[in-house]
């Protein structure tokens, strides 16, 4: 993606967003050997650095498929945080073994746009398989999840796929959610790298 859409990548960076790594060709890291994972990680980081000038500080594995070795390799290549696991509600330092840790910024399926909008089997298989969700229901879910995280001092991570949320009818969901979050007044909209700085990785 970085090499094919370098101008768009630079525009995203210019607008103040962080560029993190996500494999090279959307590889399932869990199915690769350690050597293959290392080659993918290296190629991904080099592609981003070549275009953006700086290496990425964060990594999210395509579809969340990874192994502990994936995180070790990411750390080896200078990655400072991961945002892959669904095992906590606050950032924490993932034990990589041998005294090594990596900041994990956990995600949750309820805050991911893909399951709501990308799956639509016809006929329904298995029986009762959900259809693409209604927009108002998704917005309500995301607001409720945010409210709960804010109420208990947790970390709300919204995971978005540009091809999913970027559809003309869906982008307004994100705008409405951001407006709602901003209205709360005491919310920190942080990049992963800012969280890494805060936690002192």
Feature annotation, model-predicted:
Residues 1-58, 63-112, 136-158, 166-201:
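Catalytic alpha-helical scaffold of carbohydrate-active enzymes acting on polysaccharides/glycoconjugates
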Residues 55-56, 121-135, 162-163:
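Surface-exposed cleft-lining segments at the edges of enzyme active sites
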Residues 103-128:
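Glycine-rich, positively charged active-site loop/lid region within alpha/beta enzyme cores that binds
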């Amino acid at each position: 993606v970085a090499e094919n859409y370098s101008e768009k990548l630079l525009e995203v960076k210019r607008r103040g967003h962080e560029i993190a790594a996500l494999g090279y060709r959307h590889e399932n890291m869990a199915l690769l050997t350690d050597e293959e994972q290392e080659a993918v990680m290296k190629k991904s980081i080099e592609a981003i650095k070549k275009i953006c000038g700086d290496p990425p500080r964060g990594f999210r594995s395509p579809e969340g498929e990874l192994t502990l070795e994936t995180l070790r390799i990411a750390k080896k290549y200078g990655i400072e945080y991961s945002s892959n696991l669904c095992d906590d509600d606050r950032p924490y330092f993932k034990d990589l073994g041998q005294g090594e840790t990596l900041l994990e910024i956990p995600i949750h399926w309820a805050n991911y746009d893909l399951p709501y909008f990308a799956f639509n089997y016809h006929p329904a298989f298995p029986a009762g398989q959900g259809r693409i969700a209604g927009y108002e229901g998704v917005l309500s879910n995301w607001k409720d999840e945010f409210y709960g995280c804010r109420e208990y001092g947790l970390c709300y991570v919204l995971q978005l796929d540009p091809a999913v949320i970027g559809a003309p009818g869906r982008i307004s969901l994100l705008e409405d959610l951001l407006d709602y979050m901003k209205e709360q007044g005491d919310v920190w909209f942080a990049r992963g790298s800012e969280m890494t700085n805060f936690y002192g990785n």
